[in-house]
Amino acid sequence: MGMRPPAGLPSLSKRSRVLLVLALVVAALLLVGPRLISTYTDWLWFGEVGFRGVFTTVLVTRLLLFLVVGVVVGGIVWLALLLAYRSRPVFVPVSGPNDPVARYRTTVMTRLRLFGLAIPIAVGLLAGLIAQSSWVTVQLFVNGGSFGVADPEFGLDVGFYTFDLPFYRFVLNWLFVAVLLAFFASLVTHYIFGGLKLAGRGGALTNAARVQLAVLAGTFILLKAVAYWFDRYSLLSSSRKEPTFTGGSYTDMNAVLQAKLILLAIAVICAGAFFAAIFLRDLRIPAMATALLVLSSILVGAVWPLVVEQFSVRPNAADKESAYIERNIAATRQAYGITDDKVEYQDYQGYGTTPPRDVPADVTTIANTRLLDPNILSRTFTQQQQLKNFYGFPPTLDIDRYDIDGEMRDYIVAARELSSKSLTGNQTDWINKHTVYTHGNGLVAAPANRVNAAAGESAEEAANSNSGYPVYMVSDIASQAAGDQVIPVEQPRIYYGEVIADTDADYAIVGGSEGSDPREYDTDTSRYTYTGSGGVPIGNWFNRLAFAAKYTERNILFSGAIGSDSKIIYNRDPRDRVTHVAPWLTADGDSYPAVVDGKVVWIVDAYTTLQDYPYAQRSSLDGLVEDSIDQNTGRLLPRKEVSYIRNSVKATVDAYDGTVKLYQVDQNDPVLDAWMGVFPDAVQPADSIPDELRAHFRYPEDLFKVQREMLAKYHVDDPKEFFTNNAFWSVPSDPTIDTSANQPPYYVLVGDPETGKPSFNLTSAMVGYSREFLSAYLSVKSDPENYGKFTVLQLPTDTQTQGPQQTQNSMISDPRVASERTLLERSNKIQYGNLLTLPIANGGILYVEPMYTERSSTGPNTSTFPQLSRVLVSYREPPPSNSVRVGYAPTLAQALDQVFGAGTGSVATAPSAEEGTPPETGTTPPVEQGAAPPAPTAPATPPSGTDVSAAVAELDASLDALTAAQRSGDFAAYGAALARVQKAVAAYEAIPK
């Protein structure tokens, strides 16, 4: 007697179906709605900045990728399901009423179209969503060109590896996915409809199931054969020998390469075996072929290269890898822009032969020696130039140069920006935060080589005088009205900047109805209405609704402060604006303000990068650029593996209207050429750069830090010496902090050795590999006529010239420094500024370091900030002495005279006054609307009384004795004198204050 087929899965009630549909609609709105709103507001924003072509190109490319990959992958899966269903057996026996396969089969049959279409559509949608993110790969393939450089193994142009190969991999990967999904979809379908049975010892397949699965399996293995072919080219970016070098090694080129060809042939045979199963019912042939491929992959693809590496290469690594290291050296220099035509190497002895005052370049260098450290003085700028509590400066200031009265000088510069995080009390009300406090006020600059007055001679005078502060030149609304701007600025209002954008919702709403009163805070006596071209109009209700949803802020809808002419300003960080309009660029970690043609603009360096330049060293971008400054500010490049980098674009962002301009500065970058093909109107040609703007271009810090890491190894020409690491350099650790972070490079204005004129350079000291002695000095020019020219001064391998850490130790352990530091630390915090390394005296190295003091805080509202108190100088004397002389004085001139003798210091830039005066009270910036103003700092009370006088006298006497013993060379006397100093210091500290 026949058996009834089992019932299908229970169906939902009508009410449940309605609720399910509603839930799906709500979920779709929650998922898709924010994306649609974001797309619309982005479309408006790109139109505001004039880069809507970038937005539409990227959007269309993503949509096309979504459609093509989605249709191909979904279509292949749909076709597999269709063929499997149509070739199902006519009669499928049921094992019983509880047969689970029969229940699923019944369910599928009752909803055949749903399953037949929903599964391919879902797979296609998911595949399209994933694939659309690869729009960069597709566009570079379409628009990429030639590098004009052939790889040393296959003789193919580098463009094949950077533009073509990633696209071929992209296509191949999605074909793998499509065929694999189709195989499993067919397998499941045949199983449900009886084409595949698992009962019995070996199971059973219908002819149709066998043919379909064999074709799909054979196609998959055939694609694997194609992948083996492309794997050969990927060997040129092999990581087998990292971190020693990147690229094909001896094992890769002599074992793995041949293994790939062998596996390719075996894969073709294996694919043929599966295709043969179409006609042969015996599945043992494809099974044996598969086993052969798996076994070959293990033995030929893994074991054989391992044997070659262990028994042939390792015992003779230096000789075996020599040719491949040579390839790596050449490719890395090319990829990172450190080829011999860009880098000039000079031998440098490490000790001077000519007095600095007799060398014109040294006179210029000393006169422009930077004493102000932009990494320390942010709080000093804030306390002295903040004006209002809602203004602020970035934690790290910037350095730029200006030609004033025919003389080039470097300046510490910062825009006085709006700091939303500093708003207090009623200032944080939505109306005030977003419609009243909308912009900053002006640019503040200070000459980097001078202060307002020299600190006093004694420790007490140094720490308690109104000296050692920057000499400010302010270009703001007030100075504009008074007509006394040294750096003329026509529009000092800052609507776009780093500090302004340092909050989650960084938008401002400007403008209003026609004829409405100004609302934005400008000065204490005036209000302002924005007149610039920046901002997206929100006068119509649809845009207001879109932005209210974007920021989840109902006030945008209902506020009466928004009128028909209102605009919303957002994306106010200069770096973010650049990366938005040029998503194919990597922005430098630091943007800096400059005055160009009377306007404050932010200059942003931008890089083109590649991940797989054949044989070039691959490295982590964020790891290469991290130093002591970046650790404090968090100003790092993205986590990104690169093997090619160029600073091909300089971008500017107008601080008032947000206008973004991209300028081509490298006309020999094939990557930029490709992107200019993708976005023809995005980047302006190099000849359109105004001369005044070009004069403010700096060689970017992040690129320099990447290149110095490369030069630390890749200055070596001999591959065998490269393999031993003997001639490598290291970036010194920053001696002014307690951690082992790298010392940052420094911008300095130095004398050109040929002309003696000031040259704006970015510099870095380099020490020996795992050593502390100075090994090299790197500098790169930022001057327009010599921009990007590297000079590397190489010291002898047996040099005794101290490196930065040794110099710091010798300076702070000098008896004069140690004794005064003990006195100062009782009521002050000491900070050492940038330790500058300056080549002078035709072969010598001069170290200059400012020392800042900051009075210890005595209360929660006490305002303290750093001031320059002392200048330290270190210089190694020439043979036979080779001794290191240390200068320590309130001024650079005095410190230089201590080291070189009277006269050298006369060329240093003098402070504005000789002695400081006691600090004035009541100079802290006002705080608005209920915030308590900081209390003025009470000066520290100096020690007094006969006990203190006696202790100081004994301390001075012990230091004199220590100096005399040091000069005599009597180690016994030196030890006794040192013990006396320690005893005197302990006695002084024991006096109750």
Curated annotation (Swiss-Prot):
Q: Where is there biased composition of kind Pro residues? A: 933-942
The biased composition feature labelled Low complexity covers: 908-926
Say yes or no: keyword Glycoprotein present: no
Keywords carried by this UniProt record: Cell membrane, Membrane, Transmembrane, Transmembrane helix
Q: List, alphabetically, the PANTHER family matched.
A: UPF0182 PROTEIN SLL1060 (PTHR39344:SF1)
Protein family membership: Belongs to the UPF0182 family.
Q: What is this protein called?
A: UPF0182 protein ROP_64500
